[in-house]
Amino acid sequence: MKISILSLFPELYETWINHSIISNAIKNNQVTIEIINFRLYTNDKHKKVDDYQYGGGAGMVLMIEPIVSAIRAIRTPNSYVILTTPKGQVFNQELANEFVSKYDHIIIIAGHYEGFDERINYYVDAQYSIGDFVLTGGELPSMVISDAVIRLLDGVISSSSLESESFNNYLLDYPVYTRPVVFEGHQVPDVLLSGHHKNIADFRKQQQEMITKKNRPDLYQKYLNSKK
């Protein structure tokens, strides 16, 4: 898979790309990541990428020309182009799985300032948000979306780890423990020390159901519906 991110601040991605699982995935040729500064695609001699909004209002708006030029320079017939914006559909694990199964090249546009000229929607395939809150720019959302997708690629993470993670089958992950057995009076549940695999599996499933029902009743209802 190839992921292209259009951003005004490419340097913000350096640590994310060069460490841990993402770095290993790049080294193992499981994913290619390119960060493109769309400021390079402006025809303005001052490299201007934003301007005042028509009708008045606070904040500067990203101009459409440099972004569209950047998209056209890298887009192929198989590319899926998405915009990060609080106005978009909320990105989730189901969409991450869908991206992996359907697309070989994802282009993510990370915005800044007051947002995009609305006409950008004629040149993208979808808009996505990572939650009901507003951030300074689209760099973090673009990393979040990319990270969620990359870790699902074959071989990036072991299949057993993926199977037990939160949101698999609409359930949040079960609690995990390590040494010491007792810390300041708080003890690891006895069942996890028993060595009885079925009892451990049952305990973990019960914990998943309980935690999901308490913290994410919306997901818990989906889980119940999936069992019908």
Swiss-Prot record:
Gene Ontology CC: one annotated term: cytosol
Entry keyword tRNA processing: yes
Pfam families: tRNA_m1G_MT (PF01746)
Single GO biological process annotation from the record: tRNA N1-guanine methylation
Record localization: Cytoplasm
Enzyme class: transferase
GO molecular function, one term: tRNA (guanine(37)-N1)-methyltransferase activity
Binding site residues for S-adenosyl-L-methionine: 111, 130-135
EC number: 2.1.1.228
Keywords: Cytoplasm, Methyltransferase, S-adenosyl-L-methionine, Transferase, tRNA processing
Reactions listed under catalytic activity: guanosine(37) in tRNA + S-adenosyl-L-methionine = N(1)-methylguanosine(37) in tRNA + S-adenosyl-L-homocysteine + H(+)
Subunit composition and interactions: Homodimer.
Role summary: Specifically methylates guanosine-37 in various tRNAs.
Protein known as: tRNA (guanine-N(1)-)-methyltransferase
Taxonomic source organism: Ureaplasma urealyticum serovar 10 (strain ATCC 33699 / Western)
Lineage of origin: Bacteria, Bacillati, Mycoplasmatota, Mycoplasmoidales, Mycoplasmoidaceae
